[in-house]
Amino acid sequence: MNQAIQFPDRETWDDENLAVCFPALVHGMQMMCAIEGATLVRRFGDGLPLDLFREHRWDLEEEASDVIRAGEEDDQGWFWLC
């Protein structure tokens, strides 16, 4: 695990974006990551998006680490998993 990127267990469901949003601490600075609920269902099957996220947390956090290291944030500074 990359100690420079940490993921606190503070994921939430965002009704506006229909996504699970979760913070990442990058060298102590908070960044926001997200994955759409539809993407979670497509990848992992039926279920509530928050439950699917929690079940597959380690893989999704690893993917988020890759997106953060690649600097692939959107115009709002968020890192979205596709």
Predicted stretch roles:
Residues 1-23:
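Short, charged/polar N-terminal "headpieces" of proteins
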Residues 2-4, 46-82:
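Acidic, low-complexity intrinsically disordered segments
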Residues 11, 16, 36, 61-63, ...:
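Glutamate identity and glutamate-enriched acidic tracts
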Residues 16-44:
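A short, structured beta-strand/loop element
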